[in-house]
């Protein structure tokens, strides 16, 4: 059995770790709330823009934008959003698994894959895997902006415009609740038809557009893709913080259990030492 001093040193060390994980849990909770606010604001903006796009696209039947037209697939692109830091449980690896499976299916169908990765964890993983990473971005911090993402998004949009890729997807964690974060792969281009497009087209519309509908649609579609990527980043950030909060809470609780176990061992060691001393005293008294 370890000595009393050694056990007490271990208890002190675990208590220090418990303080750190407890502080990290509180910081993650605070950051999660801020990320949720950004996520909700961005979602409302993206939904409104999608309605406008649906209205204009259905109103201009003679104009067929490339972002709205299906084409034969020989190469696809994925924008992968991960965290920059660890200590967030299995958040990143659970996101990468379905993408790796999708890449395997593409390979079997002789469809090539290009990746644009956002977040150092995705960059490290897919570069190590030998994937074709055409763009990477990291170090966005806790308050990313759309401007931070434009470069990576433009590379993929240019590839789509030039016919180098025929379909574009976004891969990120979807924030369902504080207890559920779901890895998702969603199609960005060609823009999937929304359920409410027909209703939007038939409803009364109170907007007056300045300029040609074609020019507005060209601009809006690019902004919409950028907003979807930004939405994915802030949503993934909220998932990262809630996962870190849960991981740190678990670590704090485990530290508490370990302290209790070590305290029990320390008490037993002390009891054993006292019993031995009493036995020696009794033996000495009997000898006299």
UniProtKB/Swiss-Prot annotation:
Q: List the disulfide bonds.
A: none
**Compartments reported by the entry:** Cell inner membrane
Any one annotated GO CC term: proton-transporting ATP synthase complex
- Which keywords, in A-to-Z order, does the entry hold? ATP synthesis, Cell inner membrane, Cell membrane, CF(1), Hydrogen ion transport, Ion transport, Membrane, Transport
Describe, as the record does, how this protein assembles with itself and its partners: F-type ATPases have 2 components, CF(1) - the catalytic core - and CF(0) - the membrane proton channel. CF(1) has five subunits: alpha(3), beta(3), gamma(1), delta(1), epsilon(1). CF(0) has three main subunits: a, b and c.
The name of this protein is: ATP synthase gamma chain
What InterPro entries does this protein map onto? ATP_synth_F1_ATPase_gsu, ATP_synth_F1_gsu, ATP_synth_F1_gsu_CS
Q: Say which family it is in.
A: Belongs to the ATPase gamma chain family.
Q: Which PROSITE patterns match?
A: ATPASE_GAMMA
Taxonomy of the source species: Bacteria, Pseudomonadati, Pseudomonadota, Gammaproteobacteria, Alteromonadales
Give the GO terms filed under biological process for this record.
proton motive force-driven plasma membrane ATP synthesis
Molecular function terms in GO for this entry?
A: ATP binding; proton-transporting ATP synthase activity, rotational mechanism
The organism is: Psychromonas ingrahamii (strain DSM 17664 / CCUG 51855 / 37)
| Stated role | Produces ATP from ADP in the presence of a proton gradient across the membrane. The gamma chain is believed to be important in regulating ATPase activity and the flow of protons through the CF(0) complex.
Respond yes or no to whether keyword Cell inner membrane is given for this record.
yes
UniProt keyword Cell cycle present:
no
**What HAMAP family does UniProt report for this protein, alphabetically?**
ATP_synth_gamma_bact (MF_00815)
What topology does it adopt in the membrane? Peripheral membrane protein
């Amino acid at each position: 059995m370890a000595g009393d001093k050694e056990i007490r040193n271990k208890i002190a060390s675990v208590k220090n770790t418990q303080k750190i994980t407890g502080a990290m849990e509180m910081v993650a909770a605070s950051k999660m709330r801020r990320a949720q606010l950004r996520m909700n604001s961005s979602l409302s903006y993206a939904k409104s823009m999608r309605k406008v796009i649906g209205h204009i696209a259905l109103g201009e039947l003679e104009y067929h934008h490339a972002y709205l037209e299906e084409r034969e697939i020989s190469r696809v692109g994925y924008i992968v959003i991960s965290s920059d830091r660890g200590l967030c449980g299995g958040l990143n690896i659970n996101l990468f698994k379905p993408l790796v499976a999708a890449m395997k299916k593409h390979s079997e169908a002789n469809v090539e894959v290009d990746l644009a990765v956002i977040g150092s964890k995705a960059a490290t993983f897919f570069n190590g895997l030998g994937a074709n990473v055409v763009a990477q971005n990291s170090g966005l911090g806790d308050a990313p902006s759309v401007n931070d993402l434009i470069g990576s998004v433009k590379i993929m949009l240019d590839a789509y415009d030039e016919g180098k890729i025929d379909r574009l997807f976004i891969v990120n964690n979807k924030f369902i609740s504080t207890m559920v974060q779901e890895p998702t792969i969603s199609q960005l281009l060609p823009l999937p038809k929304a359920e409410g497009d027909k209703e939007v087209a038939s409803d009364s519309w109170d907007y007056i557009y300045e300029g040609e509908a074609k020019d507005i649609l060209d601009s809006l579609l690019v902004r919409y893709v950028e907003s979807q990527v930004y939405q994915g980043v802030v949503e993934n950030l909220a998932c990262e913080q809630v996962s870190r909060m849960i991981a740190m809470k678990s670590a704090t609780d485990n530290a508490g259990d370990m302290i209790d176990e070590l305290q029990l061992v320390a008490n037993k060691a002390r009891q054993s030492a006292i019993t031995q001393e009493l036995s020696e005293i009794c033996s000495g008294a009997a000898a006299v």
